[in-house]
Curated annotation (Swiss-Prot):
GO terms for cellular component: cytoplasm; extracellular region. Belongs to the BPI/LBP/Plunc superfamily. BPI/LBP family. One of its GO terms (molecular function) is lipid binding. Glycans are attached at residue 139. It comes from Mus musculus (Mouse). Disulfide bonds join 161-196. Pfam families: LBP_BPI_CETP (PF01273), LBP_BPI_CETP_C (PF02886). This is BPI fold-containing family B member 3. InterPro entries: Bactericidal_perm-incr_a/b_dom, BPI_fold-BPI/LBP, Lipid-bd_serum_glycop_C, Lipid-bd_serum_glycop_N. It is found in: Secreted. Residues 1-20 form the signal peptide. The lineage of its organism: Eukaryota, Metazoa, Chordata, Craniata, Vertebrata. SUPFAM superfamilies: Bactericidal permeability-increasing protein, BPI.
Length: 473
């Protein structure tokens, strides 16, 4: 079966993407042309777009050439018209529209040329011609401009739709040559006009997907992230680039403005046939900053929270630093109060993600039926390794303790070398603190919806001050 062509020129942008620099703190999305083509193809397969075309002229006696059409109501071929001998031909209607095959080409600085290859089958009947079947090839050329919706989302607007009907074949039935020529001429004027709504419907589906890119994503008890478009889309010969600005808000609705990196992110080149999302350091810092502000990083550790092989008594502490206990008796339970009063620092570089959390540790002795006795206070830094795992909607973070360094801030009995406690404290933190911290991090780093691209199986690349997710269509 020969294929026709829909050609759709999307005037998406008049500039090309910058040379790998993300000047803002935004999320940079690069949509490969294959993803755009797949979105359009899926809109034709899964939706009612093609069925709506079939429903345009399907009534038996109200078809294109039926009553009220070209043969009825004073139509060109109606009784008394030029060719009254076919006055009883009726019900010519679209029975089948071949699923278009989508191909497109990105034109840097111009737009996108989209080709939809299809063929239309029409059926009809009449006493002189019997059962009639026609096949028509179609070439619809449309121009679409990029505008902004009232919500501030990118939207494609159909500006002009011109059509060219290709070869028409008589598959079955009989039509005298003069009549066939007139039918062909009439179809050239009428039939392609019925197919312009296909272009409009495709644009509507794509616009819905583009609109979903800019959305409000909840961050659990921390707040939310609103994705907005920072600039108009840019276009290269392989991808469309969206500079998306993430606006983080607290649970009360206040905009959170944490420090941003001064040096632009150098985004690596995108490989062909892949789509890419760059998640900036700003989002990581903001999530950890919200955790600190909400007190989620603070924890009081009691003996019940650690396994038996992790000691948390004055006896065990005396073996490490006896001078820290003074005159306290052995075998008393210890309490550790961890407080984080400053925002953690997230470091993304050299394919590694680390988080440094400044912490104050108050060590107390639990007195039965009494007020805990403060022993000493430590100032420390927890250095954590971050493991990043993408899903379809977010970038998940899980932390593990690499090291804990402490120094004595104040001591009631007498000063001592606090470094002797680091291994013991590290065991306590791993047993009680890390699980609680990772539970709070289940909110993850939200990802914008990019034409339904699934980043669950994406390749994660940690670069300077950003994380790049790359996925093949």
């Amino acid at each position: 079966m020969m294929l026709g062509v829909y050609t759709l020129l999307l005037l998406w942008g008049l500039a090309t993407p910058c040379l790998g620099l993300l000047e803002t703190v935004g999320t940079l999305a690069r949509i490969d042309k294959d993803e755009l083509g797949k979105a359009i193809q899926n809109s034709l397969v899964g939706g009612p777009i093609l069925q709506n075309v079939l429903g345009t002229v399907t009534s038996v006696n109200q078809g294109l050439l039926g009553a009220g059409g070209l043969l009825g109501g004073g139509g060109l071929l109606s009784y008394g018209g030029i060719f009254s001998l076919v006055e009883e031909l009726s019900g010519l209607k679209i029975e089948e529209l071949t699923l278009p095959k989508v191909s497109l080409k990105l034109l840097p600085g111009v737009g996108v040329q989209l080709n939809l290859h299809t063929k239309v089958s029409l059926h009809g009947s009449g006493p002189l011609v019997g059962l009639l079947q026609l096949a028509a090839e179609v070439n619809v050329s449309s121009k679409v401009a990029l505008g902004m919706s009232p919500r501030g989302t990118p939207i494609l607007v159909l500006k002009r739709c011109s059509t060219l009907l290709g070869h028409i074949s008589l598959m079955s039935g009989l039509l005298p040559t003069p009549i066939f020529g007139l039918v062909e001429q009439t179809l050239c004027k009428v039939l392609p006009g019925l197919l312009c709504p296909v272009v409009d419907s495709v644009l509507s589906v794509v616009n819905e997907l583009l609109g979903a890119t800019l959305s409000l994503v909840p961050l659990g008890p921390l707040g939310s992230v609103e994705f907005t478009l920072a600039t108009l889309p840019l276009i290269s010969n392989q991808y469309i680039e969206l500079d998306i600005n993430p606006i983080v808000k607290s649970i009360a609705g206040d905009v959170i403005d944490f420090p941003k990196p001064r040096i632009p992110v150098k985004v690596p080149p995108k490989e062909d046939h892949t789509s890419q999302v760059t998640v900036p350091l700003y989002l990581f810092s903001t999530v950890f900053g919200l955790l600190q502000t909400n007190g989620a990083l603070d924890l009081d550790i009691t003996p019940e929270m650690v396994p038996r092989n992790v000691p948390l008594t004055t006896t065990d502490l005396a073996a490490l630093a006896p001078e820290a206990l003074g005159k306290l008796p052995p075998a008393q339970h210890l309490l550790l109060s961890l407080r984080v009063t400053k925002s953690p620092m997230v470091l993304l570089q050299n394919k590694k993600a680390t988080v440094s959390i400044p912490v104050t540790i108050h060590v107390l002795s639990s007195v039965p039926q009494g007020t805990p006795v403060a022993l000493f206070q430590l100032n420390g830094v927890m250095t954590l390794n971050a493991h990043l795992a993408p899903s379809s909607t977010k970038l998940h973070i899980s932390l593990s303790l690499e090291r804990l360094s402490v120094q004595l801030a104040s001591s009631f009995p007498q000063p001592f070398d606090a470094s002797r406690l680091e291994e013991w404290l590290s065991d306590v933190v791993r047993a009680a603190y890390m699980q609680r911290l990772n539970e709070h991090l289940e909110v993850g780093i939200p990802l914008p919806k990019i034409l339904n691209v699934n980043f669950a199986n994406s390749v994660v690349d940690i670069i300077e001050n950003a994380v790049v997710l790359t996925v093949a269509p």
